[in-house]
A protein has these predicted regions:
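A short beta-strand motif that forms the metal-chelation/ATP-contact edge
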Residues: 42-54, 174-184, 290-308
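ATP-binding N-terminal substructure of ATP-dependent carboxylate-amine bond-forming enzymes
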Residues: 1-81, 103-105
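Active-site nucleotide/adenylate-binding loops and adjacent lid/helix of ATP-dependent enzymes
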Residues: 59-60, 69-217, 262
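Residue-level "edge-of-site" marker
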Residues: 37-39, 96, 132, 285
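Extended, charge-rich helix/loop segments that form flexible
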Residues: 203-252
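A short, surface-exposed helix-loop junction/capping segment
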Residues: 1-9, 59-62, 98, 132-135, ...
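C-terminal active-site "lid" helix and adjoining low-complexity regulatory extension at the edge
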Residues: 243-266, 272-279, 286-334
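A short glycine-rich, hydrophobically flanked beta-strand micro-motif that places a catalytic Asp/Glu
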Residues: 36, 162-166, 173, 277-290
Length: 334
């Protein structure tokens, strides 16, 4: 059955990877069994000799990655330390906790009260994100101490800690690796608003905020210059929302290789190897400051979404990824 047929009729909440797993099972002759009343949140994949269970949400769809490697990658600060030790250029940064709970187990210098001093060391401008966040939630530029305070107030409702990093500007790419081999690379682009000739940028942002909220993703209206808010976009005109480029937050991707692809791919490979990941999506900057050879890893994803491949009609790459997973846990022979 084509992947598009499996997608048809699924509820919007049904996990993408559950659909892809069923598609791969049909292709490779394995048994797929959904075990949560049709939600797709839990399922098993079985061969003639064994069965393996998978779960959505915080569950991993990449069993070839060890729990140690995957959880290390999920902590953006610790992952950065490990990569830096291996000689991988990263964005650096420091972490700060937002609540008093568990303070007895933490080293000094990383509480909310300490964030202001570090922020000033960065020139009172930084890129902020939750320490263990995903999908671009609360990932944004903070440009003043007042904005930092407001940001920490809001993010503390949902997360325990944040990472503050110096600002870098460049072209952003995602490199997807399986056992060190590049499966694909794609350039990431920021989200855009499309004018209707009637609505102001502020009004279009309100609609965007509402759509993001339904998916549990923060908005970034504070990152928009107030001078633009009342401007009415002509019909069809596109206006870039500054900041994050995650597809889940309205960004886009297209297949592309960096200008210095060999160097970029080598950087991604060193990052994955440093963390011990067999499957990983490495997000990196190239062309930093206009220098095409300047590159740094942004972060490493051990449980990345692959919806981009479905939307691009690359069912073959989805199957390659799931075959790699099935082989790694003994459901298929090499």
């Amino acid at each position: 059955m084509p992947l598009s047929d499996l997608r048809t009729g699924r509820q919007p909440f049904y996990p993408d990877q559950s659909i892809y797993a069923e598609f791969a099972c049909q292709t490779f002759g394995l048994d797929f069994a959904e075990i949560d009343g049709g939600t797709g949140l839990a399922f098993t994949v079985s061969s003639a000799t064994r069965s393996v269970a998978f779960g959505a949400g915080r569950g991993s769809f990449f069993p070839q990655n060890s729990a140690t490697a995957a959880t290390l990658a999920n902590d953006k600060y610790l992952a950065g330390l490990v990569m830096q030790r291996a000689g991988v250029a990263t964005l650096g940064g420091q972490y700060f906790f937002l609540h008093e709970r568990y303070r007895a187990y933490r080293p000094p210098g990383h509480e909310r009260a300490d964030a202001g001093a570090y922020f000033r060391d960065l020139g009172s401008s930084a890129f902020a994100k939750p320490l263990a966040g995903s999908r671009g939630d609360f990932a944004q530029v903070v440009g003043s101490e007042a904005a930092l305070g407001a940001y920490l107030d809001e993010v503390s409702k949902y997360y325990d800690a944040v990472l503050l990093q110096p600002l870098f500007a460049g072209r952003e790419y995602r490199v997807f690796l399986l056992d060190g081999e590049v499966l694909f690379s794609a350039q990431k682009m920021p989200p855009v608003l499309v004018g209707d000739g009637l609505s102001s940028i502020g009004e279009l942002l309100v609609a965007d905020v509402a759509a993001l909220g339904l998916r549990g993703i923060s908005s970034v209206p504070s990152a928009v210059d107030e001078r633009w808010i009342d401007r009415v976009l002509p019909a069809g005109e596109r206006w870039t929302i500054p900041g994050r480029m995650n597809r889940s937050a309205g960004g886009s991707m297209h297949f592309a290789e960096p200008d210095h692809a060999e160097a970029a791919f080598a950087l991604a490979q060193r990052a994955a190897a440093a963390l011990g990941l067999r499957a990983a999506a490495i997000d990196l900057f190239t062309d930093i400051g206009g220098d095409p050879t300047a590159m740094r890893v942004i972060e490493v994803n051990a449980n990345p979404s692959i919806r981009f491949l479905e939307d691009s009609g690359r069912d073959d790459l989805i199957l390659k990824i799931w075959r790699h997973s099935f082989v790694s846990i003994g459901l298929l022979d090499v």
